[in-house]
Curated annotation (Swiss-Prot):
Signal peptide: none annotated. The lineage of its organism: Eukaryota, Fungi, Dikarya, Ascomycota, Pezizomycotina. It holds the Pfam family DIE2_ALG10. Keywords: Endoplasmic reticulum, Glycoprotein, Glycosyltransferase, Membrane, Transferase, Transmembrane, Transmembrane helix. This is Dol-P-Glc:Glc(2)Man(9)GlcNAc(2)-PP-Dol alpha-1,2-glucosyltransferase. It is found in: Endoplasmic reticulum membrane. InterPro entries: Alg10. GO terms for biological process: dolichol-linked oligosaccharide biosynthetic process; protein N-linked glycosylation.
Amino acid sequence: MNAQPRSALALAARYAVPFGLLLIPIWMTQVNSVVPEPYLDEAFHIPQAQAYWSHQWTQWDPKITTPPGLYLFSYAVCALILLLRGSPEHLDPPALRATNAAAAAVLLPLRLQTALDTVRKQRNTRPSGAWLSHTVLNICLFPPLFFFSGLYYTDVLALLVVIEAYNWDLSRGRPNAVKLETAVFLVLGVLALLFRQTNIFWVSVFFGGLQVVRRLRRVTKNCESTNVADILAAGSRNELYDPLVLDASLVDYVKTAASLCSVALNNLGSVITSLVPYLIILATFGGFVLWNGSVVMGHKEFHTASLHIAQMLYIWPYFVFFSWPLLLVPMANIVLPKFMLPKFLNQGFPASRRRLPSLLTVLIILPIMLAVVHFNTIVHPFTLADNRHYVFYVFRILLNSHPYTRYVATLVYFLGAWMIISAMGYSPVTAAPGLASVVRTQAPPASATSAEERTEKTQKLERKQKGFKKSAQVASSAPAPIDPKVLADLQEHIRRRQRLEHETSRVSFVLVWLAATALSLISAPLVEPRYLIIPWVMWRLHLPPSPTPVIYRRASDEKDLEARIAVNFPLFLETVWFLLVNVITGTLFLRGGFEWPQEPGKVQRFLW
């Protein structure tokens, strides 16, 4: 990622990445041209922002359920522009949409790049004109995110402030971190709650959980045992059981959770100290809920909290639909026998990692999914009452095509979950290196000396008599034996660095991500693709980069371009797929309008 491109084509591609972000203002311009008036939720957001612009701070539309962060951001941006340019004096829909598009095209990519470089522990050495990576461009082109970047919705800014808080939280973990970084993180964590209430689960649970895991990794060794009792006992010795995702079975997730709890109890003071900033943010949110009487702001009767576990089933086909280009190569390496795997796709994974879900996993997870579908399929009245949303058509197929369709869909949920979680651990990381060989400190027994060795000794003695001083100097330069204890300490240091550098490939990260995702989704009765933007972005940020195929790992200069194409093919395929989806959904929105019989003359439009 940081290497300088070796070909003109690679250099051109690198500089072309930022220009891809111009699609965002182009999309917004098209929306303004065809839909100049507020559409759908904009009918609530835009008048509220205009009220704030008129300094009517106490006016609030009860149909709005999210906090006022979006309107405050637009007020600050437009006030600054007014100060510099003398306009705009009135905030019309295009002006407000422009503040959202600017955040999506300028601020969000820059902060995403910082987060990506930090997560992957890489320095950004790209030249200024090519500062953004292909991965960041693809995240910004993610269809639900891209679509709402041209409208006046809360999604872009809700994501932006979470990413910015994450950057500061990651900077707190550096050895030279200062109290200022913690203070800034606290401010950003609270600000994140002003844009969307469910951000609390990302700035407190997700960030806090990862911080605890990082803290525990610094003070622990690997637990070599796989026995549950031994794993729990090993916690008192600061040994953590946390395997790589591709080496883990379903039982390993339970063992890792138990090991984390055991080690955390053994380091309780350190864990509590590391959680203080997140607990402060959580307490602030709790104070808001007590003051407001509810989590939502406006019409509470339409947005009451409920236990909607089925949300954690819908997420998997959603991820697979958008990210299948990134899953093709991993799935080929895992599923296909080695003799059937094309050489340009073979990334050298051992046979132990080329396996399907175990029968035990199937027998445990599938019945749970079936039970969730049977007892917890919640259909919000808005879902089947509004045919402008794509979710309307998905649920109509699930519920109305056949009584057993929703149960058969559990196979899709299961396979999707397996693919998405497996991709999280799809990394070339192997087991920790073995101990270095110890230099002998004793000579071999005399009986073991061969005739050749005796002849060699005689020759050395003659050379010694001829040039004693020179031989003495050579002998004095021989390396001294290394203490085995030093070698053991060195190996443990390597293992610890490996755990820290590849934390996203381990079971502990998946557990924390799943917990934050579940908490942010299962309390919402309404199924909205927009609600899954932050879970997807966090998954995408932490997705390990694709390893180089074995055939190209020692490629000659003539094959260098071919190797780069092979490595980056999933990224290019992802770009093409996102552009195709954006063109289709954008065209449907702009050109595929229709009318409702109950509202003649008013154009209805398809959207996420």
